[in-house]
Amino acid sequence: MNAEAPSPIQLPAFTLLDEPALAFASGDPKAMHRHPLIGLSRFGAFDQASFRHYVSELRVAYVGPRSGAAQVRDMRESLRGPQRNTDRNSYAQAYPGFETLFGVDLLGADKQVHVVWPEELCDLGQGEKVADRIRSALHHALKRLETVRDQFDVALVYFPDRWLPHLRTKEFDAHDELKALGAQLGIPTQVLNDKSLRFDNRGARAWRLAVALYAKSGGTPWKLAPIGGVPDATAYIGLAYVIRRWLDEAHHAPCS
């Protein structure tokens, strides 16, 4: 008599997981919360105690045309104090101020550190094509910042809206160019544009930029708290996606 063939193993289509807790304030086992902004406000950053030993104040360099310097400075100053969050969703939280969150002040770097560009792309960098000029200006700016690397922690790079048609084309992407060069030279950068400078909800803007600046300066705002039954050396890879609907067609945008 023939034995029956084994049934094929079928995995479930999906599994629902509980929202994991995040760990803050290293050394305090009770410093955990599922909400990153509440956790930061209540306990402080995960590495706040050690971060202050090698970064007493977080210094920001500016790269961009002269016309944007004052706006970027004002935006940076707004991160230092409390800001009201006008979003009405459950995630939104009032922003308490940079030093309150991270234990270090947020200041502009010394004047000689900043890199000021001309107002027009035709006067920027070197090369026949606009993309070559932008690439040249980015390379010159970051190479100059490399010579004063001990005088700043992160660079804010401002691209005005009037430059946008030339910053991203089929053959060229200024953002990618900047990030690749910054990675090579060990210079963390945060890109700003007019939309971010004009953003009405200052609380939401402050949260996003403050966490980004802290992390890009070498800090760890939070980390995944230990999960029961999972080895400590386990690595996690997050995968998220959004479905954008346009003309009744679904478009998927994944991000890892």
Show which residues each predicted segment covers.
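Long, low-complexity, intrinsically disordered terminal regions
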Residues: 1-256
